């Protein structure tokens, strides 16, 4: 019998070792995430910029100064403005805008892409609301700049802390679908921008980074906690899939990274509620 006839497919590359890396390890059984040799709980107290430096050092990338939110070229802003007028899906707008960027070296491209993404996302959000984009400020951190560019207001320290907690948690997550896509593209000798635009396309999928979308749709459909059981039982009776439950890799009931995210989101939500309650009603939108 030939070797070819003995070969079998492994759906989702399960059980296949496709690469070796020192960047991160996802221990699904224990629910732990190790980033560049450090447990997530160690990194949770640090800024996102610190984690980026750690990952780039582990990868041998010499990107120079610390990463920071960067202004967008006029051509990128024009593309986003046109996309907002046409109500383009935000992930498509992100992919299209990233494709307008270019740099002279891989290290420069890495800094440019990481620095431009918060500006792209915040700018597109403002344009879809009929507001003018804001340039990042040199006196603000990466997380604080995103909040400033998104809202136009001075960011509350607790919200900055919460966003930092989120960003450090998702900075690197093993060989997931979008990372694998980017590595395949880079393996052909292509460039960073092409790899990242391909990765964004993979990230958009509802079985990857796009999963929160259908989950939120379901939350909005339920509307009130009292309706939750009725709505979910009806969906199950129709054979529909319930989004937001289970994970292909994490088997532990409460993975460390999810607990960190929940804690950060809870503190940020409490801060927003407290802040909005102090704003006179005539100033609220």
Feature annotation, model-predicted:
Residues 1-285:
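Hydrophobic alpha-helical bundle cores within soluble ligand-binding/oligomerization subdomains
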């Amino acid at each position: 019998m030939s070797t070819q006839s003995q070969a079998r497919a492994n759906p989702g590359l399960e059980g296949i070792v496709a690469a070796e890396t020192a960047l991160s390890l996802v221990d699904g059984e224990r629910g732990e995430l190790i980033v560049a040799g450090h447990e997530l709980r160690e990194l949770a107290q640090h800024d996102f910029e610190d984690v980026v430096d750690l990952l780039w050092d582990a990868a041998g990338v010499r990107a120079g100064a610390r990463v920071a939110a960067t202004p967008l070229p006029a051509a990128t802003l024009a593309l986003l403005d046109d996309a907002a007028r046409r109500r383009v899906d935000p992930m498509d707008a992100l992919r299209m805008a990233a494709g307008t960027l270019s740099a002279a070296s891989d290290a420069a491209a890495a800094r440019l892409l990481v620095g431009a993404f918060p500006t792209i996302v915040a700018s597109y959000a403002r344009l879809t609301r009929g507001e003018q984009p804001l340039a990042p400020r040199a006196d603000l951190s990466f997380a604080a700049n995103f909040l400033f560019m998104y809202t136009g207001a001075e960011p509350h320290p607790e919200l900055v802390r919460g966003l930092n907690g989120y960003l450090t948690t998702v900075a690197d997550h093993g060989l997931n679908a979008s990372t694998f896509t980017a590595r395949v593209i880079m393996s052909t000798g292509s460039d960073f921008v092409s790899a990242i635009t391909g990765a964004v396309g993979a990230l958009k999928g509802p079985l990857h980074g796009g999963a929160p979308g259908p989950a939120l749709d379901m939350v909005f459909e339920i509307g009130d906690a009292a309706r939750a059981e009725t709505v979910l039982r009806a969906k199950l009776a129709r054979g529909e899939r319930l989004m937001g439950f289970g994970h292909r890799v994490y088997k532990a009931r409460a993975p460390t990274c999810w607990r960190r995210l929940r804690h950060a989101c809870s503190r940020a939500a409490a801060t927003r509620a407290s802040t909005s309650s102090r704003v006179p009603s005539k100033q609220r939108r």
